[in-house]
From Swiss-Prot:
Similarity section: Belongs to the Mediator complex subunit 9 family.
InterPro entries: Med9
Protein known as: Mediator of RNA polymerase II transcription subunit 9
Keyword Kinase: no
GO biological process: negative regulation of transcription by RNA polymerase II; positive regulation of transcription elongation by RNA polymerase II; positive regulation of transcription initiation by RNA polymerase II; RNA polymerase II preinitiation complex assembly
Gene behind this protein: CSE2
Tree of life domain: Eukaryota
Record text on subunit structure and interactions: Component of the Mediator complex.
Protein's job: Component of the Mediator complex, a coactivator involved in the regulated transcription of nearly all RNA polymerase II-dependent genes. Mediator functions as a bridge to convey information from gene-specific regulatory proteins to the basal RNA polymerase II transcription machinery. Mediator is recruited to promoters by direct interactions with regulatory proteins and serves as a scaffold for the assembly of a functional preinitiation complex with RNA polymerase II and the general transcription factors.
A molecular function (GO) term: transcription coactivator activity
Length: 152
């Protein structure tokens, strides 16, 4: 798969995930804005053509994290001798975002706790919370029925 297709594929997937995701934690929201596509927030910029002009212009918002990594790797694979100077500039903003995310994670204990659990652990935690909510809802329905019975 070519780099433009990878960029497009991951841009769409990340955008769909970010549209459906509601983050209640401010630290996670800030990290998400660093890593998730910024197509709604920033104008698109054109990335430069490769040396041999074999690829067409590719447009991508500057804050897209995953697609930028794939594009940089594609450039390295395509022309490993010419990318040493371009690598610094093309991945500089990626390193900057990683450093900012790391700083945010170090500052916020709650975010670290949220991200510390694995997917399986979160599935168990969510199942437990749903069970607790069902029990509480049943208690509330029983109380409502008792109140209704007493008032009638």
């Amino acid at each position: 798969m070519t780099a433009p297709r990878l960029i497009s594929k991951y841009r769409i997937q990340i955008h769909r995930i970010s549209e459906n995701m509601v983050l209640n934690n401010d630290g996670l929201k800030e990290i998400s804005t660093l890593l998730v596509s910024a197509s709604d927030r920033e104008p698109e910029v054109k990335l430069e053509k490769t040396k041999d002009n074999s690829s067409s212009d590719i447009t991508t918002p500057p804050a897209e994290f995953i697609p930028s990594i794939f594009f940089s790797l594609h450039k390295i694979r395509k022309d490993p001798n010419n990318v040493s100077s371009q690598l610094e500039t093309s991945t500089g903003f990626i390193r900057h975002r990683i450093k900012r995310c790391k700083a945010l994670l170090q500052e916020n204990e709650e975010v670290r706790n949220l991200l510390a659990n694995s997917i399986e652990e979160w599935e168990n935690i969510i199942a437990d919370k749903e069970q607790q909510l069902r029990v509480k809802a049943k208690v509330l329905r029983d109380l409502d029925a008792r109140i209704e019975k007493i008032t009638n």
